[in-house]
């Protein structure tokens, strides 16, 4: 799923850095965030208000490293929500969610002076562009359960959404969760108002869509967006370079092993080079390293 904004798009992708902050992180109007959170945790109880928390924590590891998540807030009942949007590949994303949640859990326990009977609930929500689970469902809610699947504790809840697994069409979207994920997957592809689904007229989604409409942005907002686009492009370029270098390094290791094996078999320099698809100089370099060792 493409999350980077381009000049020909009318609507900014929600999963982009700017889009996430403009919708989920909209402190001036929290309607979208409240409805989205209610849908994501599958609650029948409306969230009336939210208060944004500091979204970093410092000095929690021995070497001073700190964690950072995209959004942290608390509702009117003291329930805590942590939301992170992940665009790139993150095979260990669940471990990161546990790290965030357990840090919050420790803070809640200390705040309650270790009275475990009054702990507020913690919901850690991870929204991912790519897949990390083997399950077929795009939305998963996880609690502590026994081997029979019976609930042991729901004080801490983990929610994962994998956008790539969502395949419902507009006409199939009936629940707020389905409407939310459909919007996140498609809003940046819309070029004409006639393409709007009927449910995009619902107030909570209109609030978010208006924030994503590049035509309604102030000059300052457009300037901020351009800065983020430049940063995103640079990040993508840097990440691509790292991936390329890693692949080249891995390829070099494989070729070196092939040359070493070929040398041990008594093949000539030319034969080793042809077998490993490398130059004769490369083979000679490996030979010198072997001799030195």
PLM segments and residue spans:
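Short, charged alpha-helical interaction segments and adjacent helix-coil junctions
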Residues: 1-9, 18, 81-86, 182-293
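Conserved single-residue anchors adjacent to enzymatic active/cofactor-binding motifs
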Residues: 1-220
């Amino acid at each position: 799923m493409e999350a980077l904004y381009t000049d020909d798009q009318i609507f900014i992708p929600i999963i982009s850095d700017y889009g996430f902050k403009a919708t989920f992180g909209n402190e001036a109007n929290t309607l979208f965030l409240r409805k989205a959170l209610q849908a994501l945790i599958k609650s029948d109880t409306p969230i009336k208000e939210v208060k944004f928390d500091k979204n970093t924590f410092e000095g929690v590891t021995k070497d001073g490293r700190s964690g950072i998540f995209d959004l942290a807030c608390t509702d009117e009942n003291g329930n805590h929500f942590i939301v992170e949007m992940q665009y790139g590949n993150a095979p260990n994303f669940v471990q990161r969610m546990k790290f965030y949640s357990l840090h919050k859990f420790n803070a809640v326990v200390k705040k309650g002076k270790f009275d475990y009977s009054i702990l507020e609930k913690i919901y850690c929500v991870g929204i991912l562009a790519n897949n990390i689970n083997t399950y077929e469902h795009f939305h998963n809610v996880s609690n502590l359960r026994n081997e029979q699947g019976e609930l042991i504790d729901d004080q801490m809840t983990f929610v994962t959404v994998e956008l790539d697994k969502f395949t419902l069409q507009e006409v199939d979207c009936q629940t707020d969760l389905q409407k939310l994920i459909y919007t996140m997957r498609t809003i940046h592809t819309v070029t004409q108002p006639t393409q709007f689904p009927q449910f995009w007229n619902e107030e909570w989604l209109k609030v978010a869509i208006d924030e994503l409409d590049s035509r309604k942005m102030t000059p300052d907002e457009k300037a901020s967006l351009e800065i983020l686009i430049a940063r995103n492009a640079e990040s993508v370029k840097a990440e691509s370079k790292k991936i390329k270098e890693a692949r080249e390094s891995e390829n070099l290791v494989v070729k070196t092993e092939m040359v070493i094996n070929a040398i041990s078999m008594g093949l000539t320099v030319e034969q080793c080079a042809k077998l490993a698809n490398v130059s004769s100089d490369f083979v000679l370099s490996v030979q010198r390293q072997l001799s030195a060792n």
